[in-house]
């Protein structure tokens, strides 16, 4: 299944969660798009709830179905709780950590920075958004990329860096210091429903 490339605000309203991370999509109209959006009160079946939760998390991180399933299977090989490990692996993606460090305003913008070769991991260029960063690795920008307008604009509005990431504004370089705790990950996701979906 290909990655969704349409308007993020429309998908955010349909899924009921801000995919950009800004919350602006739901500020004025926190309901599904369309004529009947404000009045939709349909009770979802268990199947529909599981599918909805899967789609919500998949689109939140901007991952296609094949990558999503591969990451889910990798999480199942780890010690601990499958659902939590799954979310930790998604959070460890390079594009996501570029976003978390404030170098991009959205995950989609972060993915473009990585794709276009602007991002370094431990001093070496990495252009694979799904690259899995390990705790202790550093993430920065190439010298010529530090003056990009999109980066400057992102840094101007960023006012929060999660506890599992450190960031040096002078060097425009950050470190993935540790894996996140579940309490530090998106609270609007019920990962147990996703585990149930793939366990059918």
Swiss-Prot record:
Keyword flag ATP-binding: no
Record's GO cellular component terms: small ribosomal subunit
Domain of life: Bacteria
Family annotation (CDD domains): S4
Pfam families named in the record: Ribosomal_S4 (PF00163), S4 (PF01479)
GO biological process: ribosomal small subunit biogenesis; translation
Domain S4 RNA-binding: 92-155
Gene3D superfamilies according to UniProt: Ribosomal Protein S4 Delta 41, Chain A, domain 1, RNA-binding S4 domain
GO MF assignments: rRNA binding; structural constituent of ribosome
Entry keyword set: Ribonucleoprotein, Ribosomal protein, RNA-binding, rRNA-binding
Classification via NCBIfam families: PRK05327.1, rpsD_bact
Subunit structure: Part of the 30S ribosomal subunit. Contacts protein S5. The interaction surface between S4 and S5 is involved in control of translational fidelity.
Alphabetized PANTHER family for the sequence: 30S 40S RIBOSOMAL PROTEIN, SMALL RIBOSOMAL SUBUNIT PROTEIN US4M
Function (record text): One of the primary rRNA binding proteins, it binds directly to 16S rRNA where it nucleates assembly of the body of the 30S subunit.
UniProt similarity note: Belongs to the universal ribosomal protein uS4 family.
This protein's name: Small ribosomal subunit protein uS4
Gene this protein is translated from: rpsD
């Amino acid at each position: 299944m290909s990655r969704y490339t349409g308007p993020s605000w429309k998908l955010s309203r349909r899924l009921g969660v801000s995919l950009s991370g800004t919350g602006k999509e739901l500020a004025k109209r926190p309901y599904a798009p369309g004529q009947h959006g404000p009045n939709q009160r349909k009770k979802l079946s268990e199947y529909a709830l599981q599918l909805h939760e899967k789609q919500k998390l998949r689109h939140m991180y901007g991952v296609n179905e094949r990558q999503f399933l591969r990451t889910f299977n990798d999480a199942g090989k780890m010690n601990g709780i499958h659902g939590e490990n799954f979310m930790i692996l998604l959070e460890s993606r390079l594009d996501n950590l570029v976003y978390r460090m404030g170098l991009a305003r959205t995950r989609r913008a972060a993915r473009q920075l990585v794709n276009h070769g602007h991002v370094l991991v431990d001093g070496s260029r990495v252009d694979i958004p799904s690259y899995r960063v390990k705790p202790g690795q550093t993430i920065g920008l190439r010298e010529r990329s530090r003056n990009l307008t999109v980066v400057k604009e992102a840094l101007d509005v960023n006012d929060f860096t999660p506890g599992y990431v450190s960031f040096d504004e002078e060097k425009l370089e950050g470190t993935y210091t540790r894996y996140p705790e579940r309490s530090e990950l998106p609270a609007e996701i019920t990962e147990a429903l996703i585990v149930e979906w793939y366990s059918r």
